[in-house]
Amino acid sequence: MRLTYFGKIGDGNTSLLRNAGLAGLLSRSSTRKANLVNSLQMAEHRGWNVAEAHEKRSIHTDSIRLEVETDSGVTVVEGVVLLEKPRLIQVDGIYCELALSGFLIFMKNQDVPGVIGHVGTVLGRNKINIANFSLGRRDAPSAPGEPLEAVALVSTDELVPESVLAQLRDNPAVKFARSVEFRA
C-alpha cells in the first residue's frame, strides 16, 4: 500500500490518515477489529508494505492518493474533502467524482452504448434506487480499435446484494462490479 499526500495535507503528521486507510482496508479482510491504534501493526503482521510520500503537485490543492497492489493488479484511487465530505475523484487514472458515504457500486466497464441503461434496468427491476451516478473514461483506448475503459460510481439507497451485482456482470461490457458500504 502506498499513500501519497498532495498539498498542505501532507505537511503535518499523517499517521492518523495512514492508520485510517489501513483500518478501512483491513476491515474487509480481517476477523480482528482494525482501528487507528492497531491497524499499522496488523498490516505489518500480514506482511504488507506500507509506504508514504508527500508531493506538491495535484489538480486539487489537498488530496490523498492510495495505491494498493494485490494478486489481481494495482488499483489507484484519489480523494479530496469538499464541503466537509470525503469525495472520490479518480480511479486508476480515470476521473470521476462521488461522495464517499452510504452505499456505492464500484464498476469497471467498456465505454459502449447500453451500459448505463443496463445498470438502471437491473437496479430498477430489483427495486434499488439510484441516488447518484458518476462516470469517467480513459482519454484513449488501451489498443487501437478497442473500446475505451470506463469507471462507474453508483450511489444507491441500500447495499446492493451479490445476486444483483451478478446481474450487472451479465453484460459482457461490465468487467467488474462490487458493492461497498461507507460508515460514518
Report the location of each language-model feature.
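A conserved regulatory-domain signal marking ACT and ACT-like small-molecule sensing domains
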Residues: 1-10, 14-184
